[in-house]
Amino acid sequence: MVEALLSGIVLGLIPVTLAGLFVTAYLQYRRGDQLNL
């Protein structure tokens, strides 16, 4: 039961972490692009 819960938490956290990193990189890219202009 605990193993299933932990695996569910991990599987839920991985996409959220990847999405957060992607959004952060995208915002930094947009900010740098605006500064270059």
UniProtKB/Swiss-Prot annotation:
GO terms for molecular function: electron transporter, transferring electrons within cytochrome b6/f complex of photosystem II activity. Keywords: Chloroplast, Electron transport, Membrane, Photosynthesis, Plastid, Thylakoid, Transmembrane, Transmembrane helix, Transport. Its main location: plastid. The keyword Transmembrane helix applies. GO terms for biological process: cytochrome complex assembly; photosynthesis. The chain crosses the membrane at residues 5-25. HAMAP family: Cytb6_f_PetG. The 4 large subunits of the cytochrome b6-f complex are cytochrome b6, subunit IV (17 kDa polypeptide, PetD), cytochrome f and the Rieske protein, while the 4 small subunits are PetG, PetL, PetM and PetN. The complex functions as a dimer. This is Cytochrome b6-f complex subunit 5. It comes from Nephroselmis olivacea (Green alga).
